[in-house]
C-alpha cells in the first residue's frame, strides 16, 4: 500500500492484494492518520489491484468513510475490482460509497 498526493491536493491510497484480518490494520491506520494529519479535500482509495476483501476490509473502508465525513473530506473508492464491487453490493454499501450497482463505474462521494 502506498499513499501519495496528487497535484490537485487529493490524497491517493493505492491498495493491493488482500484486505482481510492480516492486512486491514495497516489500511485503517493509513486512512485515519492521513485524514487527521493532512485533512485533504479528497481522499481516493484505489482498489484496482485488490484481489480479495472480507468483512474486515469492508469495515476499514467504512471507518475511513466515517472519518472523512468528520473532517469534511470527500471519500472516493476508485476502480474496485469486480470481486470488491460485488462484496460492497451484497452488503448494501454501494450507494453509501457512491458506486453504481454495476462494477466499473465508481463515482466520487461527497459527505
Regions of interest found by a model, annotated:
Residues 54:
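Conserved G/P- and acidic residue-centered "switch" motifs that form tight phosphate/ATP-binding loops
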Residues 1-51, 63-111:
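STAS-like cytosolic regulatory interaction modules
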Amino acid at each position: 500500500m502506498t499513499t501519495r498526493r496528487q497535484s490537485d491536493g487529493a490524497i491517493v491510497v493505492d491498495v493491493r492484494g488482500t484486505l482481510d484480518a492480516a492486512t486491514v490494520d495497516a489500511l485503517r491506520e493509513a486512512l485515519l492518520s492521513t485524514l487527521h494529519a493532512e485533512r485533504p479535500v479528497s481522499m481516493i482509495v484505489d482498489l484496482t489491484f485488490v484481489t480479495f476483501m472480507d468483512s474486515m476490509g469492508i469495515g476499514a473502508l467504512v471507518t475511513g468513510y466515517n472519518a472523512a465525513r468528520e473532517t469534511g473530506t470527500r471519500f472516493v473508492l476508485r476502480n474496485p475490482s469486480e470481486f470488491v464491487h460485488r462484496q460492497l453490493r451484497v452488503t448494501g454499501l454501494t450507494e453509501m460509497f457512491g458506486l453504481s450497482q454495476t462494477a466499473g463505474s465508481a463515482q466520487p462521494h461527497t459527505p
